[in-house]
Amino acid sequence: MHRPALMRSALGVAMMTILVLTLTACGGGGSAREEKANKVHRIPEDAQTYEGEPLPAGPYATDEFTPAMSFDLAKGWTRGGTELPDIWDLRDIENDAFWVVFSNADEVYDPKGSKRVKIASPPEDMVGWLRSNPHLKTEEPEPTSVGDEKGVRFDALVSGAVETPLCPGCVDLPLFRYSDGESAGVEKGEKIRFIVVNDVKGETVTIFVESSPQGFEEFLPKAERVIDSVKWGGS
């Protein structure tokens, strides 16, 4: 029996064991990182906890909004209001006047014909209805697509406000009324990119990118990256 030979054998086994454990640990870490990167996030529901907090970058899917959809977020976004079947929205974390809104409202506000806006059913021609609003100075519409569904896009300046606001502190120009009784609209002086997708699983989806005229060209590409990543049907 040669002790040195036995020692080399034992050391060799020990080193192989350490190497296997190290590789296993590294492999496990990689899997964990991949799993974290591929995790599908949801828009947080708790407004008090998540108001103004950054949303993690990565893939997302809606829980409530109809039609269901998935999308990707980079860093720099925070949640807007509570996700509902007929609206969800995002806000630029560095500027609370920069928004992306996805809407499928069953009611709209008609600003024409009286001092006070009236609640009405959504129009069949959403593009025509928006462009006919006396407080929106709109550009010519262009064809576009979102999630492989055809739509129309056009830009607008908010040139005025309704004579009688819905409430003190409410938006200057209310457009949509939602299932929770709240309204969404735009403010006088803003620049808006409207995108209307007419038939997403039988639903009309109106997307609007909202910002100041000065910040529009800078914010629009960031908003478009979210919109361009949309896939209808969720995840």
Please place each PLM-identified region on the residue numbering.
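Conserved polar/disulfide-associated segments of primarily extracytoplasmic proteins
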Residues: 38-50, 82-204, 235
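Short intrinsically disordered, low-complexity coil segments enriched in acidic
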Residues: 1-7, 116, 155
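N-terminal targeting sequences that direct proteins away from the cytosol to non-cytosolic compartments
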Residues: 2-107, 186-190, 196-235
